[in-house]
Amino acid sequence: EMPDPQPQAAPSASEEEPPAQDAAQEAQEEAPSSTGDPKIDALIQEKDRALQEMRRLNDAIEDEIISRRIDQLEDTTGKIIDQVVAHPEKLSQIRTFMNYYLPTTLKILNAYDRMGAAGVEGANIDGTMGRIDAMMDKVVEAFDKQLDALFADEALDISTDITVLEQMLAQEGLGGMQMGQS
């Protein structure tokens, strides 16, 4: 009967596995902080937190239209932050997005989730949820515009390059209709 207590020691070892997983998870979460820029490291952490919250809300909210909007917001938010991580000089361009639009959108979606989960019908709840429904298209559009704005400088540079190339081709007699005529 003495051997029986020893097999019980094995389950206590398995009880120690979750902390080992936590340590591995923490190491994984700390890995992105190797950018060397504390502001970019904080941005990456905020991205991970925001996207995780959007996924949680998306799973919790049953409305298919809101769910599609959350998918769009998640995708665009990831692209916005990835663009700034790749080009840290653009960080100032998303300050309002990160400090107001993103957290306020998450706050509103959390309120929508709580109201929907309450399962209560009433003028206040229905009216508020209706306003959130109506507003989500505008939020998606605003997030898309924020992403587009990050590419404005590149678009201008490329447009300038195209203009110069067209002018050079024309000067060399290689542009436009002349190519087919020779």
Question: Whereabouts are the PLM-identified features?
Answer:
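Membrane-proximal, non-transmembrane interface segments of integral membrane proteins
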Residues: 1-83
